[in-house]
């Protein structure tokens, strides 16, 4: 796949950045609708986004670099080069949520009211953003047979044929799962008024899908022999169950 979308003069604009931007824009449009459901201020949401989005990008990059530091030790300037990928979503979620918590505490606004509204937008952005991995030929799984990959559309087959071998399109599996979760979260946002349930459902459901999909990937970040994303996913599932149980109980 050609990772370059177009050029502006001598500057190459990559699909990775274009797709992340599209995901963010569509997430904001969805949030406009969801703010009306919860009667939350969209202006406040925009302010929150302007803090959360750059914080998430920084967090996603730092998280990735920490676990792959050997690749940057001899050329530290490359730490700042994200144009070819190298963003870890768990780092983005952690930094983004932390930034939002600090901002909303300063503004004396309800944290769970706004992250509930944000949850469908976040997972929508993740669903779209995974296609950036497709154009970068990354975040794929292990080798598969031609017979297996032939069940997918031709452009997926072409994109997953890398250096003479077909690979699991794990980016696609996660994208589809995230779209399904997004639809469910919008439904849940309409059905429940209990603050925190939608956001914690997002954490739990995303973690559930990511745990299984991560087992197929070939580019996992490791802590010893443990896949970090699977470890974080297990913690996310446990945390979401604990919080949802307590929210419903109280």
Swiss-Prot record:
Recorded topology in the membrane: Multi-pass membrane protein
EC number(s) recorded for this UniProt protein: 2.5.1.145
Keywords assigned by UniProt, alphabetized: Cell membrane, Membrane, Transferase, Transmembrane, Transmembrane helix
Protein location: Cell membrane
Record-linked Pfam families: LGT
InterPro entries in alphabetical order: Lgt (IPR001640)
A cellular component term, taken from the record's GO annotations: plasma membrane
GO molecular function term, any single one: phosphatidylglycerol-prolipoprotein diacylglyceryl transferase activity
Pathway: Protein modification; lipoprotein biosynthesis (diacylglyceryl transfer)
GO biological process terms held by the UniProt record: lipoprotein biosynthetic process
Transmembrane segments: 11-31, 49-69, 84-104, 109-129, 169-189, 196-216, 228-248
Main location: membrane
Binding-site positions, a 1,2-diacyl-sn-glycero-3-phospho-(1'-sn-glycerol): 130
Function field: Catalyzes the transfer of the diacylglyceryl group from phosphatidylglycerol to the sulfhydryl group of the N-terminal cysteine of a prolipoprotein, the first step in the formation of mature lipoproteins.
Similarity field: Belongs to the Lgt family.
Stored HAMAP family: Lgt (MF_01147)
Protein name: Phosphatidylglycerol--prolipoprotein diacylglyceryl transferase
The gene coding this protein: lgt
